[in-house]
């Protein structure tokens, strides 16, 4: 794969304006000579020669920062409303929807790189990262150079680029697509969040395949209702290209809703149960689990009259579904089924996704997982309960993030109390909230169940490791791959994996 290139060459303003079509009203400036050096919606990121897009955000209105952007060197501004007084020395583009304009301008600035890639999008509450990373591994192992964009990072070959958001803003997203194309990628696999769909971050992208993993309560502080949340997720399937197909988890109650606007011949369905009504038999992929350990599962997969064995290097029935959907994407794209299964079984471990950490004598196992919703916590605990020896204990350390959906806190407390033998409540990115107040709300769902409450996450993990006996399994949930603890706007370095490794190293 070629060397990764950072940045992009300049673009003629006239060419960018053309990408907006007739909807943009243009005033002022000298577009004939203007060369744009960058596109951004963040006035703090403006550099001389940039085009600033004034987006009305959830917290702040970009129109209030137009002056700051011009002072920083912006030579053009796209906005929905002109300032009361404005200078003709700057080119003004008045647009009906600044979010869509940001996506269109960014795509044009980076040379329509996304059109040169086979795009595969994965959406759902849980399982996006695992499924997307599995698809990426499968494509690369099958000879299709693929980049990945998702939770925490963008990966192009062996090069990792940190990301703040699961699905970045359009200017960042199209920069990443450009880097992928320049590095020789033929495909991009990306997690597509509900926020990104509603906020038009993926506007103008057309997907060869789109995957729905599941839908459970999450982000209701943003979407307000499950119906709105489901509708947001379904928007992804409206962006399939002419050859595009959907892969739907038929076991999810919203499966039929997700597929409702698609022609039957564009839908593949996956099931580990008895759900057979969603798809034509030739388009059904079914898995039956035959063996499970903390190291992973084995399953028999049937599809289109064929039956094959599938090795899943992650524990839990839900990870069988994640791999089944990744496999279905491969078959849908024309990859040889045996090749697809071999590459999936050999996929690299995913940080913070059922990541196993063992004591030196391998008698005790800790599992780090990103489970931070009620459904994810329940599935993780159920998966580990199924592989915990009858004479051993299952323990969990977890908390709930601050400044996020408060409704889930007592529910997660209830789930932990019901499914684990030992529970330790602790902090998980309290952000601007009082950590003890968050734990009070989690505790409210535990119905008096005996547990420990240790707000210091490192101390909570240390105590949990001390309590482990031979054969016991400890789930440390909520943060997964994250290497920080966010407190009052400051991200302090902290890694569950590093903390566990240190605790096991000290164990006699």
Swiss-Prot record:
Residues bound to ATP: 124-130
Q: Which gene encodes it?
A: murE
Name the residue ranges of motif: Meso-diaminopimelate recognition motif: 428-431
In terms of InterPro entries, this protein maps to: Folylpolyglutamate_synth_CS, Mur-like_cat_sf, Mur_ligase_C, Mur_ligase_C_dom_sf, Mur_ligase_cen, Mur_ligase_N, MurE/MurF_N, UDP-N-AcMur-Glu-dNH2Pim_ligase
Q: EC number(s) for this protein?
A: 6.3.2.13
Q: Taxonomically, which superkingdom?
A: Bacteria
Organism from which the protein derives: Chlorobaculum tepidum (strain ATCC 49652 / DSM 12025 / NBRC 103806 / TLS) (Chlorobium tepidum)
Which Pfam families does the record associate with it? Answer: Mur_ligase (PF01225), Mur_ligase_C (PF02875), Mur_ligase_M (PF08245)
Task: From the Swiss-Prot or TrEMBL record, give the protein name.
Answer: UDP-N-acetylmuramoyl-L-alanyl-D-glutamate--2,6-diaminopimelate ligase
Drop me one GO molecular function for this one: tetrahydrofolylpolyglutamate synthase activity
Q: In which pathway does it act?
A: Cell wall biogenesis; peptidoglycan biosynthesis
Query: PTM details?
Result: Carboxylation is probably crucial for Mg(2+) binding and, consequently, for the gamma-phosphate positioning of ATP.
Single GO cellular component term: cytoplasm
């Amino acid at each position: 794969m070629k060397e990764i290139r950072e940045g992009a060459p300049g673009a003629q303003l006239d060419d960018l304006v053309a990408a907006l079509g007739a909807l943009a009203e243009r005033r002022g400036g000298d577009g004939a000579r203007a060369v744009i050096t960058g596109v951004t919606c963040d006035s703090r990121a403006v550099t001389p020669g940039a085009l600033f897009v004034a987006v009305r955000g959830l917290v702040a209105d970009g129109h209030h920062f137009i002056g700051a952007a011009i002072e920083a060197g912006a030579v053009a501004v796209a906005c929905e409303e002109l300032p009361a007084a404005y200078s003709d020395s700057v080119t003004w583009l008045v647009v009906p929807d600044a979010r869509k304009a940001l996506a269109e301008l960014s795509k044009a600035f980076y040379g329509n790189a996304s059109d040169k890639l086979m795009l595969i999008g994965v959406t759902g509450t849980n399982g996006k990262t695992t499924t997307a990373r599995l698809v990426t591994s499968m494509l690369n192992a099958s000879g299709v150079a693929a980049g990945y964009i998702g939770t925490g990072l963008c990966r192009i070959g062996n090069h990792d680029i940190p990301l703040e958001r699961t699905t970045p803003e359009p200017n960042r997203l199209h920069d990443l697509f450009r880097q992928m194309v320049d590095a020789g990628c033929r495909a991009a696999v990306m997690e597509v969040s509900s926020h990104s769909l509603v906020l038009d971050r993926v506007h103008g992208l057309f997907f060869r395949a789109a995957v729905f993993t599941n839908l459970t309560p999450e982000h209701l502080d943003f979407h307000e209702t499950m119906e709105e949340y489901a509708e947001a997720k379904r928007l992804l399937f409206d962006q399939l290209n002419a050859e595009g197909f959907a892969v739907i988890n038929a076991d999810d109650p919203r499966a039929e809703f997700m597929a409702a606007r698609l022609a039957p011949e564009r839908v593949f369905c996956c099931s580990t149960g008895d759900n057979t009504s969603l798809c034509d038999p030739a388009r059904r992929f079914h898995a039956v689990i035959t063996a499970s350990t903390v190291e992973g599962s084995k399953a028999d997969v049937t599809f289109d009259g064929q039956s094959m064995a599938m090795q899943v290097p992650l524990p839990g029935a839900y990870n069988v579904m994640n791999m089944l959907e990744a496999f279905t994407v491969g078959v849908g794209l024309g990859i040889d089924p045996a090749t697809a299964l071999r590459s999936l079984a050999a996929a690299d471990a995913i940080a913070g996704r059922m990541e196993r950490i063992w004591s030196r004598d391998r008698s005790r196992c800790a599992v780090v997982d990103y489970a931070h919703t009620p459904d994810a916590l329940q599935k993780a605990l159920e998966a580990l309960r199924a592989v915990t020896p009858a004479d051993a204990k299952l323990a969990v350390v977890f908390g709930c993030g601050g400044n996020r959906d408060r409704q889930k806190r007592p529910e997660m407390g209830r789930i932990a109390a019901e499914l684990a033998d030992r529970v330790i409540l602790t902090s998980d990115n309290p952000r601007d909230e009082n950590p003890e107040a968050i734990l009070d709300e989690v505790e409210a769902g535990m119905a008096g169940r005996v547990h420990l409450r240790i707000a210091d996450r490192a101390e909570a993990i240390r105590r949990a490791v001390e309590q482990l006996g031979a054969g016991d399994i400890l789930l440390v949930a909520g943060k997964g791959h994250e290497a920080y603890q966010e407190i009052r706007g400051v991200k302090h370095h902290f890694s569950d994996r590093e903390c566990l490794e240190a605790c096991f190293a000290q164990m006699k």
